[in-house]
Swiss-Prot record:
This is CRISPR-associated protein Csn2. The keyword DNA damage does not apply. It comes from the Bacteria. Ca(2+) 1 binds at N116, L118.
């Protein structure tokens, strides 16, 4: 569970699973989006857990361009490759087999290095390096914005070091039924996802900061 606080709030807002936050005032909305962009150096936006521990910038996933968001970006792949390496560490027999095969490959290459006229040197290849060389990445098959959102959420759920996903103005591209389906999936995985919207998102449960800067809950069960 993540809490958010910024100057116009009287008290922190709890982001429990899927949370929709609508901000009617354009200047306040754009300012908050900017604070999220600059979270690593920003002092106005506070994100923290129920133990009052501040969220690190590396724990935040911010999506402002759904179709342009690269789930295979270098930072994400680094986390995935690291997780795969840990999986091998938990399976000693499989890890041993891979290391033996890697050693065989190294020996063959070493022999060719010795045969070469140049004075060549080499290093032993690690499992992590093998994963990178094999080009391990996420298979992307999304054809619609809804499918891309679902794909991003799945990646976020897999990445244990990410603790808050924020979609900016995604409601403009999604039907009510699609938003409901995304929220249902998010609530099942029990991780914090914030939909930050400049206008009310249908008649769904949401928090609204109106033009008088009052925070109200609408359509809450």
């Amino acid at each position: 569970m993540i809490k958010i606080n910024f100057p116009i709030l009287d008290e922190p807002l709890v982001l429990s699973n899927a949370t929709i936050l609508t901000i009617e005032d354009v200047s306040v909305y754009s300012s908050l989006v900017k604070h999220f962009y600059q979270y690593d150096v920003d002092e106005h936006l506070k994100l923290f857990d129920d133990k009052q521990k501040s969220l690190k910038a590396t724990e935040l996933m911010l999506v402002t361009d759904i179709l342009g968001y690269d789930v295979n970006s270098a930072p994400i792949l680094k986390l995935i490759h690291g997780d795969l390496e840990n999986q091998f560490n938990e399976k000693p027999e499989v890890k041993s087999m891979v290391e033996k095969l890697a050693a065989t490959i190294t020996e063959l290459i070493a022999f060719e290095c010795l045969e070469n006229e140049l004075d060549l040197e080499y290093d032993e290849i690690t499992i992590l390096e093998l994963i990178k060389v094999l080009g391990v990445k996420i298979e992307t098959q999304s054809d619609t914005i809804f499918e891309k959102c679902f794909e991003i959420i799945q990646v976020y759920n897999y990445l244990t070091k990410k603790n808050l996903l924020v979609f900016v103005n995604s409601g403009a591209y999604l039907t009510k039924d699609e938003v409901i389906k995304l929220c249902e999936y998010i609530n099942l995985m029990q991780k914090s996802v914030l939909f930050l919207e400049p206008r009310r998102l249908y008649d769904l449960p949401q928090y609204v900061i109106d033009k008088d800067y009052f925070l109200i809950g609408e359509n809450m069960v």
